[in-house]
Amino acid sequence: MEGGRCAQVSSVPASPSSGHRHRAALILARGGSKGIPLKNIKNLAGVPLIGWVLRAALDSDVDSVWVSTDHDEIERVAKLWGAKVHRRSPEVSKDSSSSLETIQEFIRLRPEVDVICHIQATSPCLHPHHINEALQKITHQGFSYVLSVVRRHQFRWEELQENEDRNPKSFNINVAQRPRRQDWPGELYENGSFYFSTRKAWESGLTELGRIAYYEMPPEFSVDIDVDIDWPVAEQRVLRFGYFGREENAAVRLFLCKVSGCLTNGQIYMSVSGEDLVTINARDVAGIQMLQKENIEVILISSVNEPLSRGVLEKVSQRAGCGLSFTEQRNALEMQKLMDKRKLHWDQVAFMGSESEDVEIMSQAGLNGVPSDAPVAELIAAKYTCQRAGGHGAVREFAEYILSMKRKSSREENHERIDKHNF
């Protein structure tokens, strides 16, 4: 089984219900996080933390995806990523409120829901197949409760109080016969990615669970974020093992970049002689060159609606060392003409935009990105949101992201080519 293993851990009689059962994914995202303020919508590798699990849930076999929150900004981000929002009541929005209380409120208001897939927002390496395989334990095999676990090889010891004068006891190791890692299967621990259960189990307060199963996830997908120190580790892990959607981005052959607001900071300076002046960042130029070295063509795009004159735009493209497309309108139809000349498809195009009129192209491109200060970020869930602003290294940052996705896909292709039977 890809990515995980399922197992039964209890045998109370139960059987799958006949007919379709509404399966709802539910992510709890309260605004009052104590460890990292508003961590659920803080960007992790260019995507809001909650966006990683929403992307996986939306591409899975569940019937609906919900975010339960008490915060306006979390609600906005959740809707932007395609989720429905359950606005929780003040009674279940307190620091002392439990997840169980919040889920019970949700199912009281949603009588159509039969199976609740409680997914943790802090598990950014979750993939749709993890959700689907665990969900089948309930929908096809008659289990009532499924939790995600990870296998760890850790020896546990008893904790003593300071005033206790005795030796601590070992829980799972004989000190005189310490096994090698490869000789010990390890133990299963909850990894906190998800808890799936039938409506009846949640309504009972999890006191009547019926048949229980666990779903084992490999360690590389078992990432949890609780405090600041977890963030950089999770960022590196998600770039390699996170779920980036159904599209294949390794085939990017054309990068289209808007000039004003992306390559420049959107400001226009005027010389004493009345000439328009703009600045471009040397790091962005280096990023363009990085893509070109990987045989990715770079074209700056602009239109008659841009505040910059065509002469200035041509100088910018010359300095950046790439092509320029100057059109009557900046829309998907004009970009399609560029692609047709090169016999390319949208999934082979990466696009960087910044304004509301860029939404159409962003929604078509196989890979899209925005600077940190882009107004369009309020309108569409970008696949990558830069930490840097337009004209301040955002193009370089997005270029590095494009290349990292290409390397990631190459690793996966090489892994698939390995003959595991003769390895």
From Swiss-Prot:
Residues bound to substrate: 30, 40, 88, 97, 99, 120
An example Gene Ontology biological process: N-acetylneuraminate metabolic process
Superkingdom of source: Eukaryota
Compartmental location: Cytoplasm
The protein's Enzyme Commission number: 2.7.7.43
Major location (coarse): cytoplasm
Gene3D superfamilies xrefs: HAD superfamily/HAD-like (3.40.50.1000), Spore Coat Polysaccharide Biosynthesis Protein SpsA, Chain A (3.90.550.10)
Catalytic activity: an N-acylneuraminate + CTP = a CMP-N-acyl-beta-neuraminate + diphosphate
Keyword Coiled coil included in the entry's annotation: no
Pathway, per record: Amino-sugar metabolism; N-acetylneuraminate metabolism
Self-association and partners: Homotetramer.
Protein name: N-acylneuraminate cytidylyltransferase B
Originating organism: Danio rerio (Zebrafish)
Gene of this entry: cmasb
